[in-house]
Regions:
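N-terminal membrane-sensor/transducer module of prokaryotic signaling receptors
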Residues: 2-174
Length: 174
């Protein structure tokens, strides 16, 4: 048995070009670390960022201004369009809280959402309207059910006023 182990060690030593056990351990740790880092990068790339959400809103606002509401809403409502990216999507309300466009859930279009609350009782649609009316644009925090995990998660939304509309995009705080 001992002789077979020595042969295996000699074979490993030969394959690694004379590398010592310390070097072998260091290489194994290094390769493992790189694998973990690549996994974290892949995980992060699955989800949108706050900067991407804000940029998406600005593009949607620009489209509304240049192409008009009707053409813009067709693109915003397209689940395979440029306003849906991973877990990011655009939503649009009128100033009374009625949803007029939604990139992720077309069933929301036409619904009055003014009384919608998160799990803490926060009227987040009312808050979006207030931000749009008083500041023109801004961020808000609320809780929302993640459609992937089905769990209630912390979320932030960037909203911006475009004429008589509120254009927004939310990002989960992961």
């Amino acid at each position: 048995m001992r002789r077979n182990n020595k042969k295996r060690i000699d074979l490993i030593h030969f394959i690694l070009g004379g590398a010592s056990m310390k070097r072998l351990i260091a290489m194994t740790i290094g390769i493992s670390f790189l694998g973990l880092m690549a996994g974290n990068i892949t995980f992060a790339a699955q989800f949108g960022t706050a900067a991407e959400a804000e940029a998406m809103v600005k593009k949607a606002v620009q489209l509304i201004k240049t192409e008009g509401k009707e053409k813009a809403f067709v693109e915003i409502n397209n689940p395979k369009g440029k306003f849906v990216d991973r877990d990011l999507y655009i939503f649009v309300y009128d100033m009374s809280g009625k949803c007029v466009a939604h990139g992720f859930n077309s069933k929301m279009i036409g619904k009055d959402l003014i009384e919608m609350k998160d799990t803490d009782g926060k009227f987040f649609v009312k808050e979006r309207i207030e931000i749009a009316k008083t500041k023109g644009k801004g961020w808000q925090d609320y809780k929302f059910t993640d459609p992937i995990t089905k769990k209630i998660e912390q979320k932030s939304a960037y909203v911006e006023r475009a004429e008589d509309l509120i254009v927004g995009c939310g990002v989960y705080k992961r």
